[in-house]
């Protein structure tokens, strides 16, 4: 399909991108119409897609897209979330019409509804998931292009691009490659210089991962603001007057001293220790615990045995 032109040949960096994204890895099942695009089969049952044929069909699809005079007449569809971001980026780069998400049945056949469209070319991400637009395109004679895996049905598909249409990196890379070739054939960008748009912008990103990355970035920014100041000790002020006596200027309240008459001890003074001293070892041991308690030696306010 490259026509023997060296400028249209697949470059080494393109092959490395295909291998890194896993575009050559097919499924474990094989459709009889996809046998011509399979190179070999691995020991674990996974089919390997021939990347040379992938590149040739990619160029053929790009030539079909460029042949449409009005870019808005090209309709790109992806019902699976792994290709929705890619088709939106492709539509913004090439000016085509996109349907990201659920395809409303009757868009190509029911002229009554407001969303009725008459495109001249249809591009889908997965023939199995996007079977409804493919079927409607066959009713109104719209040529179709599809990214097909080894187990994809090729019914109503005019140009099948063999690739891995399950992985998010492979799907994003294929749409990026297709957009780049379309812009090159239109003359928008040069083949001598690399395209400034990175393939990462076409990759699907999980919303949970995006939320985690934003949260981590916010925490990092907060921590950076906290430690942004300089760690310097406060400079002492030597111009303050020197204080010699710290008690000056402090008002101490005068407390009157209470006098007690002679013979009366001040409250709070403890009694002599010998008054309360008692020899506990001098008392005999009590054998009969049921007997009435004996009077104690100390004066505790009267020794009585009647506790009632």
From Swiss-Prot:
Cysteine disulfide partners in this protein: none
InterPro entries registered for this protein in UniProt: Ribosomal_uS2 (IPR001865), Ribosomal_uS2_C (IPR032281), Ribosomal_uS2_CS (IPR018130), Ribosomal_uS2_euk (IPR027498), Ribosomal_uS2_euk/arc (IPR005707), Ribosomal_uS2_flav_dom_sf (IPR023591), Ribosomal_uS2_vert (IPR027504)
List of residues that carry N-acetylserine: 2
Gene Ontology molecular function, alphabetical: laminin binding; laminin receptor activity; structural constituent of ribosome
Compartments where found: Cell membrane; Cytoplasm; Nucleus
PROSITE patterns (alphabetical): RIBOSOMAL_S2_1 (PS00962), RIBOSOMAL_S2_2 (PS00963)
Post-translational note: Acylated. Acylation may be a prerequisite for conversion of the monomeric 37 kDa laminin receptor precursor (37LRP) to the mature dimeric 67 kDa laminin receptor (67LR), and may provide a mechanism for membrane association.
Keywords: Acetylation, Cell membrane, Cytoplasm, Membrane, Nucleus, Receptor, Repeat, Ribonucleoprotein, Ribosomal protein
Annotated site (Cleavage): 115-116, 133-134
Region annotation Laminin-binding: where it falls in the sequence: 161-180, 205-229, 242-308
Region (Disordered): 262-308
One example of a Gene Ontology biological process annotation: spleen development
Biological role stated in the UniProt entry: Required for the assembly and/or stability of the 40S ribosomal subunit. Required for the processing of the 20S rRNA-precursor to mature 18S rRNA in a late step of the maturation of 40S ribosomal subunits. Also functions as a cell surface receptor for laminin. Plays a role in cell adhesion to the basement membrane and in the consequent activation of signaling transduction pathways. May play a role in cell fate determination and tissue morphogenesis.
Protein name, per record: Small ribosomal subunit protein uS2
Organism expressing this protein natively: Danio rerio
């Amino acid at each position: 399909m490259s026509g023997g032109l060296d400028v249209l040949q697949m470059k080494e960096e393109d092959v490395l991108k295909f291998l890194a994204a896993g575009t050559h890895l097919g499924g474990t099942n094989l459709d009889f119409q996809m046998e011509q695009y399979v190179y070999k089969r691995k020991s674990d049952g996974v089919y390997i897609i021939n990347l040379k044929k992938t590149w040739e069909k990619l160029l053929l699809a790009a030539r079909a897209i460029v042949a449409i005079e009005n870019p808005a007449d090209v309709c790109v569809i992806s019902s699976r979330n792994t290709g929705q971001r890619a088709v939106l980026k492709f539509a913004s780069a090439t000016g085509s019409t996109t349907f990201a998400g659920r395809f409303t049945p009757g868009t190509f056949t029911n002229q009554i509804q407001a969303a009725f469209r008459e495109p001249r070319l249809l591009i889908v991400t997965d023939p199995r998931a996007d079977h409804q637009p493919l079927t409607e395109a066959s009713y109104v004679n719209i040529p179709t292009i599809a990214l097909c895996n080894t187990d994809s049905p090729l019914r109503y598909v005019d140009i099948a691009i063999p690739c891995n249409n399950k992985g998010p990196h492979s799907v994003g890379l294929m749409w990026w490659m297709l957009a780049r070739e379309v812009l090159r054939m239109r003359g928008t960008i040069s083949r001598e210089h690399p395209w400034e748009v990175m393939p990462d912008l076409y990759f699907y990103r999980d919303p949970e991962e995006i939320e985690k990355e934003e949260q981590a970035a916010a925490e990092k920014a907060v921590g950076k603001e906290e430690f942004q100041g300089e760690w310097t000790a406060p400079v002492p002020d030597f111009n303050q007057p020197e204080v010699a006596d710290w008690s000056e200027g402090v008002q101490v309240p005068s407390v009157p001293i209470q006098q007690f008459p002679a013979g009366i001890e001040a409250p709070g003074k403890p009694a002599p220790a010998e008054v309360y001293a008692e020899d506990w070892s001098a008392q005999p041991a009590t054998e009969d615990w049921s007997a009435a308690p004996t009077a104690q030696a100390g004066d505790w306010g009267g020794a009585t045995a009647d506790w009632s």
